[in-house]
Regions:
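Generic intrinsically disordered, low-complexity segments enriched for polar/acidic and small residues
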Residues: 18, 66-69, 97, 123, ...
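An acidic, glycine-rich "communication" segment
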Residues: 3-89
Length: 139
């Protein structure tokens, strides 16, 4: 599907939901390299680094108002991937885009269930971030 122009989006989550994508066909599609074990930063990032303010995912968002990006899955960007947001201390990616065949891929390494990212979910631009991600991978 992605190879012919579809999309793939990966979101981090609870350890019980661990994707364990390493070594699977999904691992090949993702714009990140994932570990073969559960590897997280549960401390999070106080102020994430916006690497590309002009990227369509970042467009129109008040990143200065995002004071905290909670815990995240430790991954590394795949060759040719584009890191939109990162942890300034570890330099690990938080939001990464890539391509696979004719399609687009996105990895959001944080959580969405409110545990890790309770503060991020309260960010006024959080809904728009996901609209931007959906629009990016759909185009």
């Amino acid at each position: 599907f992605v190879h012919i122009g579809g999309w793939c989006s990966y979101q981090g989550g609870n350890p019980d939901w661990a994707g364990l994508w390493h070594g699977t066909p999904i691992d090949e599609i993702l714009p990140v390299h994932v570990s073969n074990t559960w590897d997280t930063n549960d401390d999070g990032v106080d102020i994430p680094r916006l690497n590309d303010a002009r990227h369509p995912i970042a467009a129109g968002l008040d990143w200065r108002a995002l004071q905290r990006f909670g815990g995240y899955n430790r991954v590394t960007a795949a060759e040719g991937a584009h890191v939109v947001l990162s942890d300034p201390k570890s330099r690990l990616p938080l939001i990464v885009t890539g391509t696979y065949g004719e399609g687009k891929t996105v990895a959001f390494t944080g959580g969405l269930a409110g545990g890790w990212d309770a503060d991020m979910i309260k960010w006024k631009d959080f809904p728009q971030l996901w609209r931007n991600i959906a629009a990016f991978i759909a185009n």
